């Protein structure tokens, strides 16, 4: 289902009223969100929507951050970090975790290169979220469950790293940290065989089934909003 801007605003207002957010304080609560964007060459290919996947991903990430910076709960409690990954390594586009409203003013450049180290990127993202949560706790701030949002076409080039054990090790890390970190995967198309090694199928969605990546990120934004209020 694709939402119009008006529908998104109305849905957010309904959530505010039904969940009674006006009576909830987020001053002493923080939720880290790390967005990992695949920037391998294959992401330069056109999606079913007719434009390069990497451009669709960029628009979607901007939409997500814009929502977080305007949503009453998320703008106060969410710190966001955007990283890209390819054969050149992992690039931190936000310079670490920053308030959503600050990230909304940033301009991101997703430069593509060979290879797609998906498992390495997720491993790094989990460590980053945990480190951010530890920082909250040291500052006497309530550290809520963080999110790792993976955007990819599902083609991992580091699958056989460490004698084929990298997927096992990363999934084990996610399992051990499931109370602290949630992983969700947005995939261009149905090439999810390798992603299945990371998480359960219900955490993997084909973004092209949502009548456009905007609709996927709208759904994701609403999920974050509900999570922030349900804590």
Report the location of each language-model feature.
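Phosphate/oxyanion-binding active-site loops and adjacent basic polyanion-contact surfaces
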Residues: 53-58, 114-123, 161-162
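DG-centered beta-turn motif at the end of beta-strands
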Residues: 35-40, 57, 82-85, 125, ...
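VWA/integrin I-like adhesion module and closely mimicked acidic/polar interface patches used
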Residues: 154-201, 207
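Acidic, polar low-complexity linker/tail segments
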Residues: 1-34, 40-50, 133-138
């Amino acid at each position: 289902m694709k939402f119009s801007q008006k529908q998104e605003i109305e849905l957010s207002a309904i959530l505010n009223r039904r969940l009674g957010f006006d009576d909830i304080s987020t001053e002493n609560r923080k939720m880290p969100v790390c967005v990992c964007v695949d920037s391998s060459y294959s992401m330069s290919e056109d999606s079913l929507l007719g434009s390069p996947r990497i451009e669709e991903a960029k628009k979607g990430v901007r939409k997500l951050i814009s929502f977080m910076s305007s949503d009453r709960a998320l703008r106060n409690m969410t710190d966001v970090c955007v990283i890209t990954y390819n054969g050149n390594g992992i690039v931190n586009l936000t310079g670490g975790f920053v308030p959503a409203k600050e990230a909304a003013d940033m301009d991101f450049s997703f430069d593509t290169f060979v290879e797609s180290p998906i498992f390495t990127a997720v491993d790094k993202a989990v460590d980053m979220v945990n480190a951010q949560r530890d920082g909250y706790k040291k500052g006497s701030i309530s550290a809520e469950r963080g999110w790792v949002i993976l955007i990819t076409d599902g083609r991992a080039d580091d699958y056989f790293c460490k004698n084929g054990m990298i997927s096992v090790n990363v999934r084990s890390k996610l399992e051990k940290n499931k109370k602290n970190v949630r992983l969700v995967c947005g995939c261009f198309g149905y090439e999810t065989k390798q992603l299945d090694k990371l998480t359960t199928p219900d955490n993997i969605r084909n973004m092209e089934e949502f009548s456009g990546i905007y609709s996927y990120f709208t759904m994701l934004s609403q999920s974050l909003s509900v999570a922030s209020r349900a804590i």
